[in-house]
Amino acid sequence: MDIFLAGPAAQLLARNPPHLLAGNRSLCCSFPQRRGGRAALLAVLLCLCGLMLAPASQALHQPLWELGIGVGALSTPPYRGSDSRVNYIVPFPYFIYRGSFLRVDREGGIRGKLFSGDDISFDLSLAANVPVRNEDDGARRGMDDLDPLIELGTELSIDLWRSQDRDQRFGLDIPLRAVYSVGNPLLEYQGLTLSPFLNYRIWQEDEGALMRYSVSAGPIFATSRYHDYFYEVDSRFVTPERPEYHADSGYSGSRVTISVTRHFSKYLIGAFARYDDLNGAVFEDSPLVETSDYFVVGLVFGWILGESSTMVQH
């Protein structure tokens, strides 16, 4: 669930839970659920796999830093398990830094490298969720709004396979983070999350543009305190349709994410789609869970205003 220091939003959206951007609710989208949703996801995956069959390039070099501005759009449920949707359009500053220790990029958000070897790395990482505002007719009607969350922790990345030119990678990434709400009190501990995922990436050059394709999938686990933050029904908020509920620790569902980014000399475009499945989650029987699967989609466009003359190997 990586969030960027200053906004490469396509990968921010693609790797994180669906509460990542705040802004004007100005889009209008609807998406198929259950069998229809899974069939649509399969079709998108097949299209992306077709793109991935194109030949990959040699080792790539990119500027040490890039600076610009962009705009992102996101359509998502307000929280995992809600059957309503919120739609955001958000401007953001765009900053990428590809240093040997500190990296801010589309691959993994903000990362401070604690250790890096040929096939394994251990990084510091940061994530965030925007607040959840309750609607008049939703499952959380009459309940308190939820403060935004920040997540601080580490991520272990293991390369299971890389191509000879290092422009394709299949690996296992294991983020473990402590979660804190930001509000009143200023910071309050809200549990732990663990979300290991398998990831396949391709980088290639195409007519002067750098293309990046990614497919990832994996489960999510969290403590009862984290689950209660979203799915608990305290005795104060019990109604005939909404019984008291307290969540357990354990399995939080699974997700499949695909993303494509095209990086030109002065601008970039990107898109992602994620399918989230809550079947079997320990909080699935919460009265606040209205659907057990859904889609999240996002788009991003960025303008690069300046970049370093120093090039580093990608």
Please provide the spans of the model-predicted regions.
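Residues that define the transmembrane beta-barrel architecture of outer-membrane proteins
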Residues: 65, 85-91, 118, 146-152, ...
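Short loop/turn motifs that connect adjacent beta-strands in outer-membrane beta-barrel proteins
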Residues: 59-65, 80-81, 100-121, 161-170, ...
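N-terminal signal peptide c-region/cleavage motif recognized by signal peptidases
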Residues: 49, 54-56
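Sequence/structural signature of outer-membrane beta-barrel proteins
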Residues: 74-80, 129-135, 159-163, 177-185, ...
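Outer-membrane beta-barrel transmembrane domain signature
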Residues: 186-268, 276-279
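Outer-membrane beta-barrel translocator domains and adjoining extracellular loop/strand segments
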Residues: 80-85, 135-140, 183-190, 225-234, ...
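Predominantly the C-terminal beta-signal and adjacent terminal strand-loop region
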Residues: 256-314
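Residues on the lipid-exposed face of transmembrane beta-strands in outer-membrane beta-barrel proteins
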Residues: 71-75, 91-97, 108-114, 152-158, ...
